[in-house]
């Protein structure tokens, strides 16, 4: 079975378009919502992102970053083909057909290991930023919303969060027991 759309309990729909050929065959590359708006989902491969980073470094006169052209086929989370969503464009709006944005609605940057690094809005403003553990792929150690302080995370030896630290306010600690997790705030 192939997912071709969704309908919520209010009858609102999303219809998915999948790529028929090429390196993104079978991947969702377009969405139409119930209002008839059409969105293009821009996907990239790890090899494309690595080459783009190398070209940017060359253009800036810097040494190219050491970014692999592929990611490990399998991670603790399952298979990873290296394909990531890089941008979402509004391509058709029946209410405003002549007033489509000249930039993507949202854009995503990824780390060399395929982790989400940043989210940008349509003005190009960074709205979110993520930092990951160098030793453990996919383990987020910090994130920040635009205009807010960075939230940091600490983990125990089994990979469970033990502390969420906000330097400007409310922080949390997590204690794990057999059938219970106790969360304590800094107040």
Predicted regions and their residues:
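Extended charged/polar low-complexity repeat regions
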Residues: 1-187
């Amino acid at each position: 079975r192939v997912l071709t759309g969704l309908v919520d309990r209010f009858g609102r729909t999303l219809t998915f378009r999948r790529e028929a050929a090429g390196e993104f065959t079978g991947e969702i590359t377009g969405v139409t919502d119930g209002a008839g708006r059409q969105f293009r989902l821009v996907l990239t491969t790890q090899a494309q992102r690595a080459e783009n980073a190398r070209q940017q470094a060359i253009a800036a006169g810097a040494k190219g970053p050491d970014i692999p052209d592929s990611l490990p086929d399998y991670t603790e989370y399952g298979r990873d083909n290296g394909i990531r969503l890089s941008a979402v464009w509004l391509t058709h709006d029946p209410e405003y057909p002549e007033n489509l944005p000249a930039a993507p609605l949202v854009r995503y940057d990824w780390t060399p290991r395929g982790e989400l690094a940043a989210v940008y809005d349509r003005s190009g403003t960074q709205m979110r930023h993520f930092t990951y553990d160098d030793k453990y792929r996919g383990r987020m150690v910090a994130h920040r919303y635009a205009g807010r302080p960075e939230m940091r995370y600490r983990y125990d030896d089994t990979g469970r969060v033990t502390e969420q630290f906000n330097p400007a306010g409310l922080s949390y600690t997590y204690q794990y027991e057999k059938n219970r997790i106790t969360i304590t705030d800094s107040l």
